Amino acid sequence: MAIEDLFKIVKERFVAEQPAVPASQEGDVEIPQDLLFKCPRCGAVVYNREFTAAMKVCPKCSYHARLTWQERLELTADKDSFVELDAGMKSLNPIGFPKYEDKIAKMQQQCDMNDAIKTGVCTIRGYRTVIGIMDSHFFMASMGSVVGEKIARAFEYATEHNLPVVMFTASGGARMQEGIISLMQMAKTSGAVKRHSDAGGLYISVMTDPTTGGVTASFASLGDIILAE
């Protein structure tokens, strides 16, 4: 027997005796979503309770995860102080975009909101404030007729009652399913901000991930104070 054949026999026997690796152990380790969080930027793995306690900021690289409107409200407003404005406002599919109603209904169920923004009145450390929170989980918080109208009405309410406005922006831009109507919201919201400013009102704009497109080009960039998360 040649020496090469001997090594071949030993190799085949060794490979045959290796225990099979379960499919669940191949590749990346699956992380239970309710227990651990894996940072998409640096790959660090932390306990979810620690991640949540840190306002969903990675302790290793300071990556900011996107928050829901409920999480943002809980972090900002005094407990049980929030009263929603225009709670029943919903889109009527103004240009008849195919299956738009079905997509909206699905987002409403998933995100517990009628459209991509929640507006209302609350207190922040005791100070009465009009607040708006955009949620990127709802259609990437794109600005359509409902979002624009709710923002405009929030500023009008603040102007009428001499209140400051804090707006948390997060948007992928205009909502294509509503066509030109979505672009009109840029002028509408900017006009409402201007009237609030002319009346002496304070407006704080907090830009969060992602703030892009028509939202950036309109009310998000018009704050007396602009903060970027």
List PLM regions with ranges.
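Terminal-region recognition feature
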Residues: 1-204, 210, 222
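Gly/Ser-rich catalytic serine loop of serine hydrolases
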Residues: 208-218
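Gly/Pro- and small hydrophobic-enriched strand-loop and loop-to-helix capping segments
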Residues: 223-229
